[in-house]
Amino acid sequence: MSFSPLIRQLIDALRILPGVGQKTAQRMALHLLERDRSGGLRLAQALTQALEHVGHCRQCRTLSEDELCPQCADPRRDDSLLCVVQGPMDVFAIEQTGYRGRYFVLKGHLSPLDGLGPEAIGIPELLARVEQGAFEEVIIATNPTVEGEATAHYIAQTLASSDVTVSRIAHGVPLGGELELVDGGTLSHALAGRRPIDL
């Protein structure tokens, strides 16, 4: 089926979203045009508003409409803990755990092959934040991928001479998981990171 230039433009625009391929973009575009034009207008307005008004928190670098995000603006948070994450979605995920410390959001992970070194992801800013704060512990919560592990190792090495404790989130068998279904790498991490049972 051949689409008009405007429909083709809409389909191409929708394809920039993660996980949206050609067929999904076509279905979305046709749905908006045939069944939900008012929803399409709301989507366009919300997208425009967000792109114009959402920036980055000046302290932790997560997405925020204000100079300080809600977590950084909250005086009740624990100023002794700093959790380092790879992106804003990680802040949301960790917030669901009840964590009450502060955050620092990297711009991804180290990837020399892609030209992403320490400066590109914000390591100098992280070091400045640690030096300026009263943090006792830096919790590295990068993804358990090769790049995430390399980033965590680099941060830990860089902070080794500071007065803060550097820790890494645990990796391993998920709660409710069955060992026979867990991959070897995950199980290996779980065994290496074992801890005593508190009675």
Swiss-Prot record:
Protein's gene: recR
Protein name: Recombination protein RecR
Family stated for the protein in its record: Belongs to the RecR family.
Origin: domain of life: Bacteria
Role summary: May play a role in DNA repair. It seems to be involved in an RecBC-independent recombinational process of DNA repair. It may act with RecF and RecO.
Disulfide bonds: none
MF term (GO), any: zinc ion binding
InterPro entries reported for this sequence: DNA_Rcmb_RecR (IPR000093), Rcmb_RecR (IPR023627), Rcmb_RecR_Znf (IPR015967), TOPRIM_dom (IPR006171), TOPRIM_RecR (IPR034137)
Entry keyword annotation includes DNA repair: yes
